[in-house]
Amino acid sequence: MLVRGATSGAGIALARLLKGKFPKVHLAGTSRNLAKEDQLKAIGFDQVILEKDGVLQTQEQFDKVLELVGPSAILDTFGRTAEGGIICSCALLGGQWTVSDFDPIEMLSRNLYLTTFASGNVSKHKFQALVDFVEQYHVDVRPEKVYRIDQIQEAHAYLGGSHSFGKVIVKNEDDL
């Protein structure tokens, strides 16, 4: 399995959830910054692949891909997905909202499956199932950092910087 955008909050969450239940699954992740390789491996990634200008620096193909970079990288993802593979595109980290000149017959011609997830498709039942999964498999859900509300600018700067890793919490309280 491959996660494009592995250092994002969703990428880290996927790694922790997947490895919680299936610790032996080979999990590869992409990053534009290989300095984060040790952090990614510490949370369960087995392999880290450099992504440069929306192109993976490998010819390896994957059966399943979580596409978090989005339309700016998805054409490359199609080429990195094995025949019959599944791609779930569910984020727009690359800053592009659509794919120009998308031809599904041509681009998915190797019997690829393209699916998505939208955060509006959440119910009380689904959320409880996630909480139960986290408890059952002892998934680490700690955030990278916690800020106070008066530190919101610092939190935003951290997330936008090249050293960020995962998600942060901003609390509307004095106590951290």
Where are these regions (language model features)?
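A short acidic, Gly/Pro-enriched loop at the edge of an enzyme's catalytic core
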Residues: 57-65
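Glycine-rich phosphate-binding loop and adjacent beta-alpha segment
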Residues: 22, 40, 72-136, 172-176
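C-terminal hydrophobic helical "lid"/dimerization subdomain
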Residues: 122-176
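Mid-domain Rossmann-like dinucleotide-binding core that forms the NAD(H)/NADP(H) cofactor-binding site
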Residues: 1-52
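Short, well-ordered alpha-helical microsegments
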Residues: 11, 37, 73-75, 153
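Terminal peptide-recognition signature
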Residues: 18, 40, 65, 77, ...
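N-terminal Rossmann-like NAD(P) cofactor-binding module of classical short-chain dehydrogenase/reductase
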Residues: 2, 65-66, 88
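Short beta->alpha linker loops
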Residues: 7, 31-35, 51-54, 68-69, ...
